[in-house]
Amino acid sequence: MGQKVNPIGFRLGVIKTWDSKWYAEKDYAKLLHEDLKLRSFLKKRLYHSGVSKIEIERAAGKAKINIFTARPGLIIGKKGSEVETLKKELAKLTDKEVYLNIQEVRKPELDAQLVAENIALQLERRVAFRRAMKKSVTSSLKFGAKGIRITCSGRLGGAEMSRTEWYREGRVPLHTLRADIDYGFAEAKTTYGIIGVKVLLFKGEVLSGK
């Protein structure tokens, strides 16, 4: 079970929490679609800003969006000019007042989503997949990860037949619910087709009572 299911969804309500924090009754479907629209828009718009996670909170017809990023300077811009433009674009998209909160990810090497996106970027630049995987594993362990597993699937190295290769170092206990496991997925669009990159990063165990 732990091998197949999304590690974050599996731990929701145990040690992980939801990325959308709001409650609705009759407008639930509409707001859910709005969340999806906001997330895909922000991911495309801030593609080069290293966005790790987008949290959405709603209350009284207003939306607060927390953006976790490795490069906050790119999103904020000179004297906050970029943020103001982004706010206007989001308000137009949702017809609501939008508040933005930009939070810096201090150690991108310990964020599974950012690690996956970094590997995907290297694959698009024609770096050998094994080298990209090993480099990311080494740097994550150096920054304090207890274990990491990276999987690449697709036409690796331009091979005729697609295959899956993975590389792991340290412990990655997928069945242990108290294990703090971060999960990230990214796609590399290469000339041979799409290569999927999955990253499972074990940060340690969350002890009960915390």
From Swiss-Prot:
Single GO MF annotation:
mRNA binding
Name the Pfam families on file.
KH_2, Ribosomal_S3_C
Q: Could you list this entry's UniProt keywords, alphabetically sorted.
A: Ribonucleoprotein, Ribosomal protein, RNA-binding, rRNA-binding
> Which positions fall inside the KH type-2 domain?
38-106
Parts of the chain that traverse the membrane? none
The UniProt entry's GO biological process terms, in alphabetical order, are:
translation
| InterPro entries, per database record | KH_dom, KH_dom-like_a/b, KH_dom_type_2, KH_sf_prok-type, Ribosomal_S3_C_sf, Ribosomal_uS3_bac-typ, Ribosomal_uS3_C, Ribosomal_uS3_CS
A Gene Ontology CC term for this entry? cytosolic small ribosomal subunit
Query: Which Cys-Cys disulphide bridges does the record give?
Result: none
* Cross-referenced SUPFAM superfamilies: Prokaryotic type KH domain (KH-domain type II), Ribosomal protein S3 C-terminal domain
Name the family.
Belongs to the universal ribosomal protein uS3 family.
Q: Assembly state and interactors?
A: Part of the 30S ribosomal subunit. Forms a tight complex with proteins S10 and S14.
Q: What does this protein do?
A: Binds the lower part of the 30S subunit head. Binds mRNA in the 70S ribosome, positioning it for translation.
Can you say what this protein is called?
Answer: Small ribosomal subunit protein uS3
Q: Which organism is it from?
A: Geotalea uraniireducens (strain Rf4)
Q: What is the name of the gene encoding this protein?
A: rpsC
